[in-house]
Amino acid sequence: MAAREGISGRHAVLQALRSGREVHSVLVRKESGEDPALRPIQDEAARRGLTIRYVTEGDLVRTVGGSGQGVGALVAPLAEHSAKDLVLLARAQGEEPFLVAADGIEDPQNLGALARSALLAGAHGLIVPERGTAGIGAGAMKAASGAFSLLPVARVASLPTALANLRREGVWILGADANGGKAPWKLRLTGAVCLVLGSEHDGLSQQTLDALDERVCVPTPGGDLSLNVSAAAAAILFERVRQAEAKRT
């Protein structure tokens, strides 16, 4: 039997269907079958020739690992990429690589939110270490609202090694560091860049810090508390969007 994994939540399932990702089955909680919010999923499943299975909540949880919004699906695993693949993908589109990397992010919801922000900001891919970082399971998929069906992901054995290889490809390595760094708007973010985000508690590992070209820190004039990792990422990512738009006008 072909490998498959479970996802749950309306956005995650709908994006999987629309993206062309291989979907083996769609499951809807019986009590949610008449929910008008599920109509786009039902229509897209029909377009792809998939018969929706209406199941109990218990069966939904057992099959896909969650019951978010009463809908889930069994899908093919994400395509495997290397960090260099992401660079080549960007350059094939005639663009400078714009990548995001996660260093020890443990909360699946934060990883999912990071993927969502990266996709919406126009990143070409996400780099995730094989160890020490949350897996891309049901929790991350739900928080990403379908982003993982559209955003290429590279799983790497060693993030510092991957960053060193990216530098050899001409990619500038920028790390978000709550302990200090330049404000995002004081840096030129529109070239070939990989933005690295650290763990919720410890930030970037020393090995990753040693691999950086520059550090960036989002100022928080309202107090000494630090931003959540996904919030800090969004602030930096969309400063890059602002700079890119300003460059075009």
Language-model segments: residues:
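Short basic, glycine-rich beta-strand/loop surfaces that mediate nucleic-acid
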Residues: 63-76, 144-147, 152, 190-198
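Short glycine-rich anion-binding loops that position phosphate/pyrophosphate groups of nucleotides
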Residues: 32, 60, 77-79, 105-107, ...
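N-terminal positively charged helical leader segments and presequences
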Residues: 1-92
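Short beta->alpha connector loops at strand-helix junctions that form conserved
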Residues: 56, 76, 103, 129-130, ...
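Active-site/ligand-binding-proximal alpha/beta "capping" segment
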Residues: 174-229
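Structured adenosyl-cofactor binding patch, chiefly the S-adenosyl-L-methionine
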Residues: 14, 120, 142-147, 206-249
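RNA substrate-binding interface of SAM-dependent RNA methyltransferases
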Residues: 18-22, 37-40, 50, 88-182
